[in-house]
A protein has these predicted regions:
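Extracellular/lumenal/periplasmic "stalk" regions immediately C-terminal to a signal peptide or transmembrane helix
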Residues: 1-85
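Sec-exported extracytoplasmic/periplasmic mature domains
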Residues: 47, 54-57, 75, 121-128, ...
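Short amphipathic alpha-helices and their capping/turn segments at secondary-structure boundaries
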Residues: 78-80, 84, 116-126
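Short, aliphatic-rich beta-strand segments
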Residues: 91-96
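Periplasmic OmpA-like peptidoglycan-binding domain that tethers envelope proteins to the cell wall
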Residues: 100-114, 118, 126, 136-232
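Short Gly/Ser/Thr- and Asp/Glu-enriched loop/turn motifs at secondary-structure junctions
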Residues: 86-90
Length: 233
């Protein structure tokens, strides 16, 4: 459950509690509703909503600062091959494969080092965030005759190996805590455009560095949600 969904649910619960209170005040002969208890529940729900709004606002602000700091650190040339976006509370850094990897390989290209060092600095600065490295390919099958593709069966393997290369590069070269890193491959099954043109294929061949607030923080928030179901009578 996302923070936005949790906030929306709490607002619905709050409205239901308020409605119950209004009904009970109109029907003073009703003995099955404890008005003072209902007021307490409304106050608790309202306090929790305010807390969620504060957390979401802080998270959104940190994401924008993170995104802006990274964008400012990148050169004009780098920005042609690196796309930084904030979507639904998550920072997405999309890197073009022709910049990141040696041609037809999953080994990191030397010219990617400077860009990755800037991304690593941002990751190190924001220690309360987890980092998912996600590899994506176009729909062209792997060439099994290429010596660089030895033992690579398909685009699943290639995308996962490329993501793993970035993870290990960040860990080994820049000291990023490996406990914060996850490598994943999505093969050809997460395209952002059609593979019918060369330009489309090029856009789909990308690696995304996805920076998210640690999940356990949000699970703790959800666990603290007030139980209002009993009030909706």
């Amino acid at each position: 459950s996302s923070l936005e969904e949790q906030l929306a649910q709490q607002k619905r619960d709050y409205a239901a509690l308020q409605q119950s209170l209004d009904k009970s005040l109109l029907n003073t002969n009703s003995n099955n509703i404890n008005i003072s208890k209902l007021v307490d529940q409304i106050n608790e729900s309202n306090q929790y909503i305010r807390h969620l709004v504060e957390v979401k606002s802080k998270s959104d602000s940190l994401n924008m600062v993170l995104s802006n700091n990274l964008t400012r650190s990148l050169s004009r040339e780098e920005l042609k091959e690196v796309d930084v976006q904030v979507l639904k509370g998550v920072v997405y850094i999309s890197l073009a494969d022709n910049m990141l990897y040696k041609s037809g390989s999953y080994e990191i290209n030397d010219r990617a080092a400077e860009t990755l060092s800037k991304i690593a600095k941002i990751i190190m600065d924001y220690k309360d965030y987890d980092v998912l490295i996600e590899g994506n390919t176009d729909d062209v099958p792997v060439n099994p005759t290429s010596p660089l593709m030895k033992n690579i069966r398909n685009n699943w393997d290639l995308s996962a190996l490329r993501a793993s290369s970035v993870v290990q590069y960040l860990q080994n070269n820049y000291g990023v805590d490996p406990k914060r890193l996850t490598a994943g491959g999505r093969g050809e099954y997460n395209p952002i455009t059609s593979n019918s043109t060369e330009l489309g294929k090029q856009r789909n061949r990308r690696t995304q560095i996805i920076i998210t607030p640690k999940l356990d923080q949000f699970m703790e928030l959800i666990d603290k949600a007030p139980e209002n179901g009993s009030a909706q009578q």
